[in-house]
Amino acid sequence: MMEKRAIIKSLRINYVVSFVAALVVLLAFELGFIEKGLLAKTVSSTTLYVMQVATVLLTVSLIPLAIKGFTSSLEKAKGQPEADILKLFCKRSLQRIFLLFIVVVFSEFVYYALGYEGALYCGVLGYGFMIYCFPTEMVLDQYLADNKE
């Protein structure tokens, strides 16, 4: 069984790597390593529309899934041994980070490569929720305390 501190440390490393990777994509477009509007001229209007809708749908579906899915899965695990709760917390936290990473990177890509301004708002939402989901010992302790009740 991993200790609580080791779990939090591992989750924080994954969180920081995901956040930095999303920032690298952002900087690649901002600094001109990848051309802005790269696909805007080459894709059809139908493809452009599908990408715009996909951006909004990913944001609207994955952010609540990352937030509510995390808490509901841990609520359902009440009464389990502490080792199982720790494993579930680690697994769900990684899934949460990954889902938000998908939202952020896809939104950045659609904003810069296609020029869809709505993707900017989706990306900002994704970054905001990524900051909200920073793994802390306090949250883990709260779930462990709730499990003991």
What residue ranges belong to the model's regions?
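Cytosolic-side membrane-entry/anchor segment at the start of a transmembrane helix
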Residues: 1-24, 81-83, 148
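Alpha-helical transmembrane segments
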Residues: 45-62
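Membrane-helix interface/capping segments
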Residues: 63-87
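Short, amphipathic, aromatic/basic-enriched membrane-interface segments that mark the entry/exit
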Residues: 85-96
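Alpha-helical transmembrane segments and their membrane-interface junctions
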Residues: 100-122
